[in-house]
Regions:
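Bacterial Sec-dependent N-terminal signal peptides
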Residues: 1-29
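Non-catalytic cap/lid and distal C-terminal segments of serine-dependent acyl enzymes
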Residues: 27-282
Length: 282
């Protein structure tokens, strides 16, 4: 009888372990955008890309950013905002030139898969000469990416909220980015939960703070976040930075979406990240 009891316990433990593995696999199921998601479609309504200039007291100059307004944009309607950040070798045009966010979003609108939003693509290198020229890894240029936090919060967001019909509460403000911009998004978003409820990091770079610095209070983060998205390519040499953040979040039971998908440190992964992230917003 005792032997049967031991066998039964072993069987229950085995089944429980199997279910746990299956649950983990289900949670990590890779989501890939459908064919054509990033191809222009001339039969649908399209949003508009404009260049804006704003005075940055942080940097002491006038700075540029791109802004995407959705199809059917009206000054009589108020919109949530996504701040979409570039990588260390880019500027405010990197997403536009390499990631065609306007096409991805236009297609999603046409399919009724996202809510109308304004997307701001700033220059995350907050220094007087913010062009990606010369040694982009120079200490002052790397530091400028950290300095952008103040420029974003004190200069750019107030400019957008003064000049565009946007919703101004944290639940209608998102931040996401690729590589260096992914690290910025995690650092700034998780570091300012009173300002952002939606945070996404695509292939986040080494500038990403250590998990215990990003999320010193897991319970508070769990309460305040509407969405935390972390994704990376399986061949990306920077994968360890996303992985360590995910493992910390999992250990501390902070809800988040994490996916490792086929790809390297490239726009194939980042475009899919934007596609998936945008569908979950607001």
């Amino acid at each position: 009888m005792k032997q049967k009891s031991i066998s039964m316990k072993k069987m229950i433990l085995t089944v429980a372990c199997a279910l746990s593995v299956l649950s983990s696999i289900a949670q990590q199921q890779v989501k890939i955008a459908p064919d054509g998601f990033d191809k222009s479609n001339n039969t649908i309504l399209k949003g508009k890309i404009d260049t804006i200039s704003y005075v940055s007291k942080t940097v002491g100059t006038t700075r540029k950013a791109l802004i995407y307004t959705p199809p059917g944009y009206s000054s009589q309607q108020r919109y949530p905002v996504l701040y979409l950040l570039h990588g260390i070798g880019g500027d405010e045009k990197e997403w536009l030139n390499g990631g065609v966010p306007h096409i991805i979003l236009d297609n999603l609108y046409a399919e009724g898969k996202i809510k109308p939003m304004i997307v701001v693509m700033p220059n995350g290198r907050a220094m007087p000469d913010d062009r990606a020229v010369g040694n982009i890894m120079a200490p002052d240029k790397v530091q400028a990416f950290a300095n952008f936090e103040k420029d974003l919060l004190s200069d750019l967001i107030p400019y957008i909220e003064k000049n565009y019909p946007v919703l101004t509460d944290r639940t209608n403000r998102a931040i996401a980015g690729l590589s260096m911009g992914g690290g910025q998004s995690l650092n700034f978003g998780l570091g300012n939960l009173d300002q952002f409820a939606w945070v996404g990091g695509f292939s986040s770079a080494p500038n990403t703070k250590k998990p215990e610095e990003l999320i010193p209070d897991p319970a508070r983060a769990s309460r305040m976040l509407k969405l935390l998205w972390i994704s990376c390519g399986d061949k990306d040499r920077l994968l360890s930075f996303s992985k360590r953040t995910h493992e910390y979040l999992e250990q501390h039971k902070v809800p988040h979406q994490y996916q490792i998908e086929p790809g390297d440190h490239d726009f194939k992964v980042w475009k899919n990240g934007l596609y998936q992230f945008a569908r979950l917003l607001f």
